[in-house]
């Protein structure tokens, strides 16, 4: 264990002299410390000793900037111990209770009607400013700008932008130009379709373009029409527009839906789905994708009708209906005609075998599937 001999008194003596010091420790091994310069950081205030003659030097407290004096930011206005004065407008207080300026201006000593027992020190931004400002008055602000009388210089100042902001503005303008070109192309396409349906009106084309935008967001045709009218603030041929055609979620114009058009599309969709798959015990992922694609391409069918068709054509029958003799199933599986699926038959409490297509999709990817027959 190392033992320190007179280190405390030596450190105090060297610290009082304000010089670097070095200390040697005596013990089993000699340990030398590097010369360390003492740097003293003032925090709040220097503490006084208790055994002196009470005649130490003063701390130079009091007013440093009188009423009406012009000060710069961080200039000390008042040094104190405790809060004889409180920081007011455009001033702040330090950890040693020193009040200093935060803005360039003129010193004002004042009372605040909301705090009648406190004395405040603030900074007025102009020589005519008096504190405190009215409670409901707008806050005085200094922008650090002067009026430019030269028109050319004023125009150049208005056009000036930082480099980062200028690059960002260029990118935004490019994206805006591309978007405007796409919107114009869509408007022309919709105008051509409207002309085929007997409507030759540029305002209707612009309205249809706005409706197409809202429809891509998932809104209904009625919601898209209402918001498009509010955006364009027009009512020309609105009734005729709503009565003859509507805009789909794909951004195309189609005739107005009716029970006949819905029934016709329902029958056509059912015929397409029948060609893709007949209800049986197996279904593949490719068949599921084709069914979803056909249903998504519909225009007039409601969501409930789409769900009903999906349930009808995606359902799989019980695997027990596809059970074949064990020898034939195993022989076909070995020849690569399909994959072997084991099915548990609850009635006879045994295992049956089913030959499923190679691309068959099961709800659960398991080698052993249980089927419960009631």
From Swiss-Prot:
Organelle targeting sequence: 1-41
GO cellular component: mitochondrial large ribosomal subunit
Superkingdom as given in the UniProt entry: Eukaryota
Subcellular location: Mitochondrion
SUPFAM superfamilies: Ribosomal L27 protein-like
GO biological process: translation
Keyword check for Ribosomal protein: yes
Alphabetical keyword list: Mitochondrion, Ribonucleoprotein, Ribosomal protein, Transit peptide
UniProt main location, coarse: mitochondrion
GO molecular function, one term: structural constituent of ribosome
Family assignment from sequence similarity: Belongs to the bacterial ribosomal protein bL27 family.
PANTHER family from the UniProt entry: LARGE RIBOSOMAL SUBUNIT PROTEIN BL27M, RIBOSOMAL PROTEIN L27
Functional description taken from the UniProt entry: Component of the large subunit of mitochondrial ribosome.
Protein name listed in UniProt: Large ribosomal subunit protein bL27m
Name of the coding gene: MRPL2
């Amino acid at each position: 264990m190392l033992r320190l001999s007179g280190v405390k008194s030596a450190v105090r003596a060297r610290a009082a002299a304000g010089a670097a010091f070095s200390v040697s420790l005596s013990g089993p091994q000699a340990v030398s410390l590097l010369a360390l310069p003492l740097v003293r950081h003032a925090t709040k205030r220097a503490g006084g000793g208790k055994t002196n003659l009470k005649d130490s030097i003063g701390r130079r407290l009091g007013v440093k900037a009188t009423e009406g004096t012009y000060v710069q930011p961080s200039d000390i206005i008042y040094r104190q111990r405790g809060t004889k004065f409180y920081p007011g407008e455009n001033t702040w207080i330090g950890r040693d209770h020193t009040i200093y300026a935060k803005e360039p201006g003129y010193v004002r000593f004042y009372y605040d009607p909301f705090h009648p027992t406190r004395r405040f020190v603030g900074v007025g931004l102009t020589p005519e400013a008096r504190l405190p400002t009215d409670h409901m008055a707008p806050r005085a602000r200094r922008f650090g700008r002067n009026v430019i009388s030269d028109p050319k210089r004023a125009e150049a100042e208005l056009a000036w932008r930082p480099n980062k902001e200028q690059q960002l503005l260029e990118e935004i303008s490019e994206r805006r130009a591309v978007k405007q070109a796409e919107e114009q192309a869509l408007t022309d396409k919709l105008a051509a379709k409207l002309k085929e349906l007997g409507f030759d009106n540029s305002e209707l084309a612009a309205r249809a373009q706005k409706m197409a935008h809202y429809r891509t967001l998932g809104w209904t045709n009625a919601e898209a029409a209402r918001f498009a009218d509010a955006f364009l603030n027009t009512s020309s041929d609105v009734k005729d527009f709503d009565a003859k055609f509507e805009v789909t979620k794909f951004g195309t114009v189609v005739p107005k839906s009716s029970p006949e058009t819905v029934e016709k599309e329902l029958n056509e969709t059912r015929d397409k789905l029948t060609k893709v798959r007949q209800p049986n015990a197996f279904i593949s992922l490719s068949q599921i994708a084709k069914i979803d694609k056909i249903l998504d391409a519909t225009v007039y069918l409601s969501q409930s009708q789409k769900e009903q068709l999906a349930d009808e054509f995606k359902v799989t029958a019980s695997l027990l209906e596809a059970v074949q003799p064990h020898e034939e199933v195993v022989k076909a599986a070995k020849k690569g005609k399909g994959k072997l699926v084991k099915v548990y038959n609850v009635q006879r409490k045994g295992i049956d075998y089913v030959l499923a297509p190679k691309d068959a999709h099961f709800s659960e990817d398991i080698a052993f599937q249980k089927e419960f027959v009631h």
